Regions:
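Hydrophobic/aromatic-rich core segments of domains that either
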Residues: 190-195, 199-201, 213, 386-396, ...
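Bacterial N-terminal signal peptides
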Residues: 8-17
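Intrinsically disordered, low-structural-confidence terminal and linker regions
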Residues: 23-66, 70
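Short amphipathic alpha-helical segments that mediate assembly, nucleic-acid/protein binding
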Residues: 27-31, 39, 53-54, 78-81, ...
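His-Asp-centered catalytic microenvironments across diverse enzyme cores
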Residues: 368, 383, 398-399, 441-442, ...
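Secondary-structure boundary elements
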Residues: 67-70, 77-397
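Extended amphipathic alpha-helical coiled-coil/heptad-repeat regions
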Residues: 516, 520-524, 530-714
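Bacterial N-terminal signal peptides that target proteins for export
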Residues: 1-8
Length: 715
């Protein structure tokens, strides 16, 4: 990466450039000048590092203004993007990078400028948590990449080799593989038997159901852990073969193949873990399991693999049956970023891809196994057995099962394997998935959630990085939705707003503060989903009035846009961001200022409990706060939405908890909560048609704060 002094000098020059280019015509007019300047500086930086870039490669980028903006205008330092694009071209060839899969190449180059790839991959194989790359992409001359899918890395060891002394792992494997067959219960899917009507005609057959069957097979490590009798045999066998110190005691069916209960006995859990480690280590040492997980692919290998699959020649019938392509890989690069982030090892991908390609298998949900999944060691012990893949792989998730995190991983990874951008996502106490999709009729893109459990888009945070603002990191679902909506509203205008952000960031702080409102007005006129510009403007707002003005500018542009007007979550998210900025700024100095600010906040339907509380206290101290919160409780009780909307009930409960947090002292907090409960007397429960009466979550929260017991339900 460039030396810090070089970056500092570049920043100074960009400040001058941006200040001159913006002028009176606004930030959009500076986009082309900024891109041209960054092009020159980036090519100079490449040359200074000895990175040879062919003239025709540079000319190819220059020939397409949108491509040039994407390469030179979307990162503060475009050099990693430029070199990654060239590196991909060296490995994959001009046809893939310059013609058929340019957008995928840009997405990978952009993604890899944010998140470094490593041999081990990332925890959930979506680049979440990856560090910024320390090295630049390699553009040295080399032969084109030949895509090779690794084979099974296991090399079985002869555990009876007479030419050497057998070790403890040999004996463990020999016990298992030489043992007589045992009865084992397995779950299988079977179609129900055919039924016939009175005329002897077969009725439509039902769906396959899971049934348990007993089969004969040699024991696995998991079988020994599950059986006290097999444990006794194992201990005797190991002692007879010179290893009396190797003993296991896991109880009888404390953990078994279909266990769902967690192990609460700490000593028992430790003994089961020891047994698991014995079998697992023996399987790995003797080639029954891989010694380690396969390495993650390079960016070129990853792209080559996706391109190869995209070019697969399905016949028309199979293409229709597979709904192929699941997502167009020539889609604009911003909507491909979650796919570009995938770093699953190729062999793991290939196994799932082959089943999809040949048999149409597309499974996005595995076996849900209950509380034992919260104990990874016990989850692993219940099914430890030979397998061609390691822990962390989707194949191991299929074998072992899990809870929501495993299900989300299976879903997101499977979507990406078939070429569809996807990621896991967090909800309160739950893991879900999100994915990009394209409407076949309208051609529009959307970011959609799946496996939701504890709320909708409004409580969902995507794990894949939101890599559009030069910072990256996790963002709420709506941020990723704005990418799809923004591309629908105009791919080039969307990229223009990303370049505008770079121009804006290069301005001096005082100039950014002065232009905060105009940035939003001008940016959203170009593309109404430029949330990155809104964030930047709010961060630069020097006082509450400026933040209020930024939100007003946003609302005016969104209201004028047919595409954006109905996006309520987008609008409330920006509203909440604006009011969070107001809260972070100094409060008004007197009651008059607090009242004026409160009027503006109420006009903007402020839902920030802490900010409202600060304003109320600024107007009239604690008595004003108490009166205002009681008024809010009465309005909530009289609202018809209270009975209709669980979301509204939970929102008010959250506000009540936030207000309580602002009350100092345990006794004062309890007194405030008791007063807040008074309007709820006789109305503590919610009656929803078709359901049992349930306690209002606000009442539950206030009772805990007040230290009062639950009262009998009233009508």
């Amino acid at each position: 990466m460039p030396h810090p002094r070089t970056l500092a000098a570049l920043f100074v020059s960009l400040v001058v450039l941006a200040s001159r280019a913006v002028g009176a015509d606004g930030l959009l007019s500076a986009v082309d000048a900024y891109v041209a300047e960054m092009r020159g500086r980036t090519l100079e930086a490449a040359s200074a590092r000895g990175a040879a870039l062919p003239a025709d490669f540079v000319a190819w980028i220059d020939s397409d203004p949108l491509l040039a903006k994407s390469v030179y205008g979307c990162r503060k330092d475009p050099l990693p993007v430029l070199l990654a694009l060239r590196s991909l071209e060296i490995d994959l060839g001009e046809d893939a990078v310059r013609r058929t899969h340019t957008q995928l190449a840009i997405a990978i180059a952009m993604q890899d400028s944010y998140a470094a790839r490593g041999a081990q991959g990332t925890g959930w194989n979506d680049a979440d948590g990856a560090k910024t790359p320390a090295a630049l992409p390699d553009v040295s001359p080399r032969t084109p990449l030949s895509l090779v899918i690794p084979g099974d890395p296991r090399v079985p060891v002869d555990t009876k080799d007479p030419s050497r002394t057998l070790d403890v792992h040999d004996h463990i494997v020999n016990f298992l593989e030489d043992h007589a067959e045992i009865d084992a219960e397995i779950a299988v899917k079977e179609l129900p038997p055919l039924e016939y009507d009175e005329k002897g005609v077969a009725k439509p057959q039902g769906k396959a159901v899971t049934v348990m069957k007993t089969v004969r097979r040699r024991p696995l490590g998991a079988d020994v852990i599950a059986s006290a009798a097999l444990q006794a045999e194992f201990n005797a066998f190991m002692a007879a073969n010179g290893h009396p110190e190797v003993r296991i005691d896991c109880g009888d069916r404390a953990v078994h193949w279909y266990s769902t209960e967690a192990i609460s006995d700490k000593d028992l859990r430790a003994r089961i873990k020891t047994a698991h480690d014995l079998f697992h280590d023996a399987y790995r040492a003797k080639g029954r399991m891989p010694a380690e997980r396969d390495r993650a692919p390079t960016m070129a290998e990853s792209m080559a693999w996706f391109v190869r699959n995209d070019r697969h020649a399905f016949d028309d019938a199979t293409r229709a049956a597979r709904q192929w392509p699941r997502f167009p890989l020539d889609a604009p690069w911003p909507v491909l970023m979650m796919l570009a982030a995938d770093d699953q090892p190729l062999r793991e991908r290939e196994d799932i891809w082959t089943k999809f390609r040949d048999a149409g298998e597309f499974r996005t949900y595995g076996e849900y196994i209950g509380d034992i999944a919260q104990q990874f060691d016990m989850q692993s012990a219940r099914r430890v057995a030979p397998i061609a893949f390691s822990y962390g792989s989707i194949q191991m998730m299929w074998k072992d099962g899990g809870v929501c995190g495993t299900m989300g991983n299976i879903g997101a990874r499977t979507h990406r394997i078939v070429g569809q951008p996807a990621s896991t996502a967090g909800q309160p106490g739950h893991c879900a998935i999100v994915f990009m999709e394209r409407d076949a009729k309208t051609g529009e893109f959307r970011c959609k959630g799946g496996q939701y459990a504890t709320g909708g888009d409004e409580v969902t945070t995507v794990h894949a990085g939101w890599n559009y603002d030069d910072r990256g990191g996790r963002r709420p679902m709506v941020f990723h939705q704005t990418v799809a909506w923004g591309v629908n509203a105009g791919f080039e205008p969307f990229v223009d707003t990303l370049v505008m952000l770079r121009v804006y960031d290069a301005l001096p702080p005082e100039e950014r503060a002065r232009r905060a409102t105009s940035l939003v007005d001008e940016g959203l006129a170009r593309n109404p989903f430029a949330i990155a510009l809104v964030e930047a403007a709010l961060a630069a707002a020097p006082d509450p009035a400026a933040a209020i003005a930024v939100l007003d500018a946003f609302e005016a542009r969104v209201e004028a846009s047919d595409a954006a007007r109905g996006r309520e979550l987008y609008r409330t998210t920006v509203r909440d961001l604006a009011h969070a900025r107001v809260l972070a700024l100094p409060a008004p100095a007197d009651a008059t200022g607090a009242a004026a600010l409160l009027a503006e906040l109420e006009r903007q339907s402020c839902a920030n409990a802490r900010l409202l509380a600060r304003c109320w206290r600024g107007i009239g101290g604690e008595s004003e706060f108490n009166a205002r919160t009681l008024d809010a409780a009465r309005r909530y009780l009289s609202s018809p939405e209270r009975a209709k909307s669980k979301r509204d009930r939970e929102a008010f409960a959250a506000m009540a908890r936030a207000w309580a947090d602002s009350v100092k002292g345990k006794a004062a907090k309890a007194a405030w909560a008791s007063a807040m409960l008074e309007p709820f007397a006789g109305h503590e429960t919610i009656e929803v048609r078709g359901k049992k009466p349930a306690q209002d979550p606000a009442v539950e929260a206030l009772r805990k704060l007040a230290g009062t017991p639950a009262a009998p339900a009233h009508g």
